[in-house]
Curated annotation (Swiss-Prot):
The keyword Lyase applies. This is Catabolic 3-dehydroquinase. The record marks R20 as: Transition state stabilizer. The gene is qutE. It catalyses: 3-dehydroquinate = 3-dehydroshikimate + H2O.
Length: 154
């Protein structure tokens, strides 16, 4: 059985997880989240690999999304962070590669400042998860595994 790939993308300031506003985002670091997700994914299925990428630069995230089109990525889990609220370029990149994606936010963006309520990605995402803390990443990965089993890549 061929290996499927899920790409986990994290946007600006998420490299500061564990120390940045822990009352909102918790104390888990991005490295610990990635490691935990990888372990969890291995327990679900040996046939899916987790790829990870984080950048504070919009263009770097867009380049990585474009790369996903040719590197065998089957699904994307993305926490676009602040880019959620204004990045048409990120939206266009995600829709342009035709890879299903899940939008994740650690906090409940709808309980926060008004400017955080608008997402340029949500209407294009297969699913949107917010407010579950870092568990939201696990839920997104699990959804992707189920989706990939139901809809194999042609």
């Amino acid at each position: 059985m061929p290996i499927k790939k899920i790409l986990l993308l994290n946007g600006p300031n998420l490299n500061l997880l564990g120390t940045r506003e822990p009352h909102i985002y918790g104390y888990d670091t991005l490295a610990s989240i990635e490691s935990s997700l990888s372990t969890y994914l291995s327990s679900l299925t040996p046939s899916v690999e987790l790829l990870t990428f984080q950048s504070n630069w919009e263009g770097a995230l867009i380049d990585r999304i474009h790369e996903a089109r040719t590197d065998g990525t089957d699904a994307i889990v993305i926490n676009p962070a602040a880019f959620t609220h204004y990045s048409v370029a990120l939206r266009d990149a995600l829709t342009g590669v035709d890879i299903p994606f899940v939008e994740v936010h650690i906090s409940n963006v709808h309980k926060r400042e008004e400017f955080r309520h608008k997402s340029f990605l949500s209407d294009k995402a297969e699913a949107v998860i917010c407010g579950l803390g870092v568990f939201g990443y696990r839920a997104a990965v699990e959804w992707c595994v189920g989706y990939l089993k139901e809809r194999p890549k042609l």
